[in-house]
Structure formats: structure tokens, C-alpha cells
Amino acid sequence: MTGVQTCALPILPTVQFFCQSVNIPGVSIGQAPLTFPSIMAYTPGNQLAYNNFNIDFLIDETLTSWQEIYNWFRSFASPDGTNERNTLSNLAGQKKFGTKKPYLSDATLTIMSALNNPLVRVQFTNMFPVSISDLQFDTKSSADDIMVGTANFVYEQFKFLPA
């Protein structure tokens, strides 16, 4: 696979534009012990545990890409009151979130062939950010060095869709 991808995140247009790498998260399933006199056996559980969806993205000079995620955090934490929460609700009306909860967003990852033809689409449902990397400024860096940020998201589930 070539690793060429596109990531559609309606609530984060700048992050989407500057996206450098993403992952298809790992999945695990719980297990229930079966106790027998001489052995310990297990049976599959009934809950999937999804790993985080991670995005590495370039940080532009005005920090817009980083601020998009930071503002999403502020909208559901509302450190300055309900106005920030209302701001995200207004954005939800302008963008296609795919959900009735304004602090959640759906996202679609499209894996492309070497000829830029879509091969696989992965749809993430009801996603929201849980962490964003630090911004580290260094006077020893050259003007050509571009900062890269990482954001981690959780979601309800993901599905593979036809390309």
C-alpha cells in the first residue's frame, strides 16, 4: 500500500488540509474466563475496544490548525461559560457533522492507490478529540523546519465502506 490518504474532517478544515499521517486504529475484544477444575479457559467477550484515531498535521504559521482542535476542546469544556458551547452549536448548523450532538463529528479516511484512485474508505462515527500535542518553539530551528502536531481522537466505532 502506498500510504496515500485523505482525511475528511468537516469541523477541522485546516487540519484536514495539513494532514500528514493518520492511522486505522487497532481493535481488541474482551474475554470472559471459564473456570474448570483443571484448566482456565476463556470465551470471547461482547465489547469491542477501539484504540485512538491519531492525526499528525502540519502547524501553519498562524497556528490555525492547532487552534481548530483547541477551540473544539474549549467548546465542550467551556472554561469561559456557555458562549463557547453555543459557538460550536452554531458551527454544527453550518457544517455537516453527521450527528445530532454538536461536540461530536464523523470523519472519513480514504486510502488511495499509487494512481490516486480510492481503494478503501473508513468511516468514524461520533468522534471527538481527547489530546493534542504541545507546541515547542526553538530558536535553534531553521526557518525551513515545519512544526508537526498530533491529535488523538476517540469515537464510537468505525466501518469499512466501498470506495
Residue ranges and their predicted role:
Residues 1-9:
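Short, small-residue-biased leader/transition segments that mark boundaries at the very start
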Residues 8-163:
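Glycine-rich, low-complexity intrinsically disordered segments
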